[in-house]
Amino acid sequence: MSSESNPETQIKLFGRWSYDDLRIENAALKNVISLKPVYLPHTGGRHEHKKFGKLEIPIVERLVNRLMGQAMNSGSRKDHVNSKNQGKKLKAMRTVKYAFEIIELRTGKNPIQVFLDAIENSIIREEVTRIMYGGVSYFHAVDTSPSRMVDLAIRHIAQGAAMKAFRSPRSLAEALAEEIIAAAEYDRNRSFAIRRKEEIERIALSSR
């Protein structure tokens, strides 16, 4: 009997959450988000030396990898330098697992789908780049590529969780769950990722 017809043999994230019926509404993101069913979000760096290989990494693993490099501070630019979680992937996976359990309890939905909704709401469609003309630099608005959209969304979700957990009684898993739920609901008052998205797009709009 195939795995598709037997629910007991289906591959589920951490043995709990199914990959069935997951949806991505934004057509631009469908080719840059991998929803390949995996039990554990760990591919062992098999795509490291392949161009655009990260697009084949399961989307939950990309969140796990980002948490390893996220410093537990105010989200400074030196996150990778200040992070104390470099290489601690098991710790990061446990954090994501506990966060997903909290999301399921609070929303009653598949936490993978809630995470996908958070990414779609947090993507930055337009940003600014610096252009040099005759020794003078100008800021110019540019469209963001789909791959970078996802990268920035995951980065800001991880930063928002770290900022909520920094010097706070709540754990990183609780902060991550709160940030994902707030981003999925497009709550700019509670989500750092949503506020950051709106700030960058506002700057890009003024630089057109």
UniProtKB/Swiss-Prot annotation:
One of its GO terms (molecular function) is mRNA binding. Keywords: Ribonucleoprotein, Ribosomal protein, RNA-binding, rRNA-binding. GO terms for biological process: ribosomal small subunit assembly; translation. It holds the Pfam family Ribosomal_S7. GO terms for cellular component: cytosolic small ribosomal subunit; ribosome. InterPro entries: Ribosomal_uS7 (IPR000235), Ribosomal_uS7_arc (IPR026018), Ribosomal_uS7_dom (IPR023798), Ribosomal_uS7_dom_sf (IPR036823), Ribosomal_uS7_euk/arc (IPR005716). The keyword Calcium does not apply. Belongs to the universal ribosomal protein uS7 family. One of the primary rRNA binding proteins, it binds directly to 16S rRNA where it nucleates assembly of the head domain of the 30S subunit. Is located at the subunit interface close to the decoding center. Part of the 30S ribosomal subunit. HAMAP family: Ribosomal_uS7_A. This is Small ribosomal subunit protein uS7. It comes from Korarchaeum cryptofilum (strain OPF8).
